[in-house]
């Protein structure tokens, strides 16, 4: 396989020259950097061939002479160096930046009459649409790099990979004496425009050029042109190789980095911060970032000189550029800047103060806030923001809006249109900001961070609402009772106590809600939909908050703990209910009997005693219950399940029954009578005992008007009115109301006359006293 093509390489091929006018526009540090780059390029050529004579430019640099003059007319050195262009360490990136800064004020008006076919030049001269011209073309006098970029595209070093490479370079050298193809005579202010390489249309700002090129990417002509460019690039082999190790590279900049390994030169270092860099162009960019230029009139500092020139251009631009409305916005030479005081920033130069740029050139100013604007419409827009004036009105809903641009978004919401769609899930949105928040939720990104507690949020509004907790800020106040709240939703929920409106009502049960999202959650009760499923136990829930609280059961996380007893809870609401145990607060009162309860569920269950409602019915036996938990415990009996078991082997369907049973083993009697100091194991026993002191008999038989202190006594009594005899004898079939009566009857068949024990006597006496008490009542 043949190696890379070799041809005579001289210092003129890697050098760049300035005219006297261009040299004067360079700053001192840029001149020193240029001299250093030229010396480095010369040392690279010397390392390849020691017999190379010293050029006149290097001699002037070493003697410290002023560098300007007609450098285009130089003698060619007598000796030529035959080497591969791929092995030369050339710093062209820094030279390009020097050219851009020096030729910012010097604009050429030379017209090139040479016409080259772009497709032909691609294969013949190594150039194509969108590439730069060879760096050696730039030393010709009178050719501006800005104009070259405007008509001929960007610039890179071009290496020809054909056998007739030397002949092609001669054709290029003959073309240097003319100018670049396609260069036209333009005025000085038009030379700062950016040109699209596809349609040749000019624009003032680069972001407009980028948007324009994105539009071309959809056209068929652009796709054909780009496909040809890629095919031509693929045909060129990687012939840029290192002579030391033979490694090949696609771009020259990769070879430049690789040559530093062989030469082991000392890396360039910044004289101020002593920071080292791999390449001098990186050091040059570091100089630009650290060195700040200052505007001479407004004393505002900038990082680059282009910002200073742009500031000067805005101050000195003619009046018709500010007032003429016929010029399209993307072709106006100056960027739009707004006031910094009220946070209305423009697209560029956000560090400029209003007094610097706006000064006398902006005739329209806001009287209250002091903001200055280029046109009267901008001033009127800010005035409407502060005064609350609505400029436009929707023809469909008659709603008035501050800005005309909001009218389209508002009409999309009325029609149900969602022009912005998510590519992953297909969900639609009326605004782009809604899509942005949606993508953060899908990706799990939480870019908003609280500096005090370290909690992350996916939306900025969530962070602002969270920070009110740290600041103890309550901006929302009730107009009736003057209570303040952190969130607006809490205020709306509070206002319902004063008779607030509930505009969203359920069509099935008629229940009304303040928010539409609450109505959606309620509709899942009727439809039975449970969209949130636990990934561990596969249990489904109607609400996402309930799912999160359920997942804490698996993780054993208890983020909400009581400050008095240290008990932890998985939900904030459970902690709030627990606080009432310590404080003794009972905020829920029954309107009929004035009894108070700690929980709202307890009040609802109690009210069913007055109404007789039993909404929870067992699907197997049809038995109804007032409380849902009692129905679930009853269903466990049908399945033979006893999830709560004692150490003695006895099982229970409810945990409360297990707790009551454990007191039989421990002997604990937590319920004490305040009058006689007698203690009881169950609360029901205490209530029954207190009836002896008060004489109260709350349980009433509806058939015979008898009253009882205990519910069990009433149920035993009601068996008298029923024809059923649930306890039947197996021998004779006689039925009995009570089980004790059946036991006495069985002794007749067995003829067993046992001596009653003392516990049986006490039991008989208690039954006797209960019957006597029922008869006396």
UniProtKB/Swiss-Prot annotation:
Gene3D superfamilies: 6.10.140.140, Classic Zinc Finger (3.30.160.60). One of its GO terms (molecular function) is zinc ion binding. The keyword Repeat applies. Keywords: DNA-binding, Metal-binding, Nucleus, Repeat, Transcription, Transcription regulation, Zinc, Zinc-finger. Pfam families: KRAB, zf-C2H2. It comes from the Eukaryota. InterPro entries: C2H2-ZF_domain-containing (IPR050636), KRAB (IPR001909), KRAB_dom_sf (IPR036051), Znf_C2H2_sf (IPR036236), Znf_C2H2_type (IPR013087). One of its GO terms (cellular component) is nucleus. One of its GO terms (biological process) is regulation of DNA-templated transcription. It is found in: Nucleus. Residues 9-80 form the KRAB domain. A zinc finger (C2H2-type) spans 194-216, 240-262, 268-291, 420-442, 448-470, 476-498, 504-526, 532-554, 560-582, 588-610, 616-638, 644-665, 671-693, 699-721, 727-749. Belongs to the krueppel C2H2-type zinc-finger protein family. May be involved in transcriptional regulation. This is Zinc finger protein 786.
């Amino acid at each position: 396989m043949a190696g890379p093509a070799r041809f005579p390489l001289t210092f003129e091929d890697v050098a760049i020259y300035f005219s006297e006018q261009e040299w004067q526009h360079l700053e001192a540090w840029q001149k020193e950097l240029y001299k250093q780059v030229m010396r480095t390029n010369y040392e690279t050529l010397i390392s390849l061939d020691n017999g190379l004579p010293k050029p006149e430019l290097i001699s002037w640099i070493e003697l410290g002479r002023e560098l300007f003059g007609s450098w285009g007319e130089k003698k060619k050195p007598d000796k030529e160096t035959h080497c591969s262009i791929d092995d030369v360490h050339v710093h062209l990136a820094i030279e390009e930046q020097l050219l851009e800064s020096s030729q910012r004020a010097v604009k050429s008006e030379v017209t090139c009459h040479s016409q080259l076919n772009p497709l032909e030049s691609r294969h013949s001269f190594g150039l194509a649409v969108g590439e730069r011209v060879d760096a050696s073309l730039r030393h010709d006098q009178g050719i501006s790099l800005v104009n070259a970029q405007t008509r001929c595209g960007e610039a890179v070093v071009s290496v020809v990979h054909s056998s007739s490479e030397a002949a092609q370079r001669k054709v290029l050298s003959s073309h240097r004496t003319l100018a670049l193809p396609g260069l036209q005579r333009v005025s000085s202010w038009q030379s700062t425009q950016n040109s699209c390489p596809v349609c040749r249309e000019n624009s003032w700002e680069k972001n407009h050029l980028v948007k324009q090129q994105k539009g071309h990417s959809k056209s068929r002509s652009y796709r054909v042109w780009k496909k040809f460019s890629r095919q031509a690039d693929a045909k060129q082999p990687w012939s840029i190789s290192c002579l030391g190790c033979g490694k090949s590279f696609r771009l020259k900049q990769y070879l430049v980095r690789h040559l530093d390994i062989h030469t082991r030169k000392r890396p360039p270092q910044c004289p101020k911060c002593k920071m080292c860099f791999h390449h001098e162009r990186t050091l040059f960019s570091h100089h630009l970032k650290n060195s700040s230029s200052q505007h001479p009139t407004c004393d505002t500092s900038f990082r680059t000189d282009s910002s200073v020139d742009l500031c000067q251009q805005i101050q000195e631009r003619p009046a018709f550029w500010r007032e003429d409305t016929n010029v399209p916005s993307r072709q106006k030479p100056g960027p739009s800047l707004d006031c910094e005081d009220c946070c209305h920033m423009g697209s560029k130069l956000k560090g400029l103060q209003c007094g610097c740029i706006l000064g006398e050139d902006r005739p329209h100013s806001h009287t209250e806030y002091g903001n200055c604007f280029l046109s009267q419409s901008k001033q009127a827009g800010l005035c409407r923001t502060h005064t609350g004036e609505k400029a436009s009105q929707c023809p469909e809903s008659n709603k008035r809006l501050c800005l005309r641009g909001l009218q389209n978004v508002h009409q999309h919401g009325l029609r149900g249109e969602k022009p912005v769609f998510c590519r992953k899930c297909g969900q639609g949105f009326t605004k782009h900001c809604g899509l942005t928040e949606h993508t953060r939720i899908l990706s799990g990104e939480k870019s908003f961070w609280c500096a005090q507690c370290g909690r992350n949020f996916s939306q900025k509004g969530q962070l602002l609402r969270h920070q009110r907790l740290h600041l103890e800020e309550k901006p929302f106040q009730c107009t009736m009772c003057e209570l303040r709240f952190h969130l607006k939703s809490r205020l709306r929920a509070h206002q319902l106590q004063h008779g607030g409106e509930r505009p969203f009502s359920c069509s099935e049960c008629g229940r009304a809600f303040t928010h539409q999202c609450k109505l959606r959650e309620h509709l899942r009760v009727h439809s039975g939909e449970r969209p949130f499923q636990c990934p561990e136990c596969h249990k489904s829930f109607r609400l996402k908050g309930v799912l999160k609280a359920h997942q804490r059961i698996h993780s054993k996380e208890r983020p909400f703990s009581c400050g008095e007893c240290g008990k932890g809870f998985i939900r904030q609401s459970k902690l709030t209910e627990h606080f009432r145990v310590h404080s003794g607060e009972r905020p829920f009162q029954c309107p009929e009997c004035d009894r108070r309860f700690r929980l709202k569920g307890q009040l609802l269950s109690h009210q069913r005693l007055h109404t007789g409602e039993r909404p929870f019915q067992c699907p197997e036996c049809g038995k109804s219950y007032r409380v849902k938990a009692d129905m679930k415990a009853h269903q466990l009996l049908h399945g033979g399940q006893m999830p709560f078991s004692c150490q003695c082997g006895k099982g229970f369907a409810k945990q409360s029954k297990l707790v009551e049973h454990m007191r039989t083993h421990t002997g604990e009697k937590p319920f004490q009578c305040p009058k006689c100091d007698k203690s009881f194991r169950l609360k029901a026993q205490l209530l029954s005992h207190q009836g002896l002191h008060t004489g109260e008999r709350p349980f009433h038989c509806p058939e015979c008007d008898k009253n009882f202190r205990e519910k069990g006594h009433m149920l035993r009594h009601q068996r008298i009115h029923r024809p059923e005899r649930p306890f039947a004898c197996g021998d004779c079939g006689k039925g009995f109301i009570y089980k004790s009566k059946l036991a006495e009857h069985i002794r007749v068949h067995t003829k067993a006359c046992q001596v009653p024990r003392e516990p049986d006597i006490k039991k008989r006496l208690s039954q006797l006293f209960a019957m006597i008490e029922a008869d006396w009542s």
